[in-house]
Amino acid sequence: CGEAKEPSNELQEGSNFIPFEGTVFVSNNILNSSDNSSFTSLKKIPNEERTMFDRRINDDSKDYAQGSWINITPFLFTAFFSDGTEIEVQVNDEFENNIEAESVALSYLKVIGKLPKLFRKEVETIWIHKGNEDFGGGNNNLLIHHDRGLEYLRDGFLEEVFLHEAAHTSLDSYHSTSKGWINAQLADNGNFISDYAKKYPKREDIAETFPLCFALEFKRDRLEDEVIQKIENAIPNRIKYCLSVFENNN
């Protein structure tokens, strides 16, 4: 998935309340440098051929996301986390050598380690390419394009982008079509947290909503009062659903 553009003023469509254009850029302080990372170490493993998704390669058969599958032999590593999880990191061989590949991987892994385990639990691989393209989630994976990553890092939104993409990877398949989530959507009377979620309710509503609910519950003091009020007014039933998921995954 791509990320919606930085939010404009709140949108009103008829009786529906949609407070944000997209939620990734609502706050760059949901996770920050003060948060601990569960990432502990990175181990080089033998390079082997892998199938990776690269957004720089056009596939005209897809109308929602630029990119295509490629088969290459990337630099391979295993990342270890203190909660016992492991992730295979696949770094495109366009990077100069093992040292550069490892350096680039490390720049993201500490941030990924800040994500709650709930958001990381289905992440089995990470793909890292050059290029200024959207990040992606799903496929038990996090997709990174390094030039865009440097922009997110500069602007302070790298953690929030990973929250969004990891929600796709670890939460979509469990919740996007669940009875409880659909009932919560209906009970919110046509409201969505963002214009992006409303446009793609099956594909984006989970990833747009869960990170802000996480912020409400665990990082509330980092959100502006106006933002809190907008979230709570727009999607009270989705908030209850998210909180029940957090409680059951403690």
Which residues does each predicted region cover?
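Bacterial Sec-dependent N-terminal signal peptides
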Residues: 1-23
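Auxiliary, metal-adjacent structural segments of Zn-dependent hydrolase domains
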Residues: 10, 41-142
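Structured segments of extracytoplasmic/periplasmic soluble domains
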Residues: 114, 118, 165, 169-173, ...
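Structural recognition of the beta-strand scaffold that forms the well-ordered cores
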Residues: 125-127, 143-145, 171, 205-213
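Solvent-exposed loop/turn segments at secondary-structure junctions
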Residues: 132-135, 149-152, 168, 176-177, ...
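Short pre-active-site segment immediately N-terminal to the catalytic Zn-binding motif
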Residues: 144-163
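Catalytic Zn2+-binding segment of zinc metalloproteases
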Residues: 159, 163-181
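Metalloprotease/metallohydrolase-associated module, dominated by Zn2+-dependent proteases
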Residues: 184-250
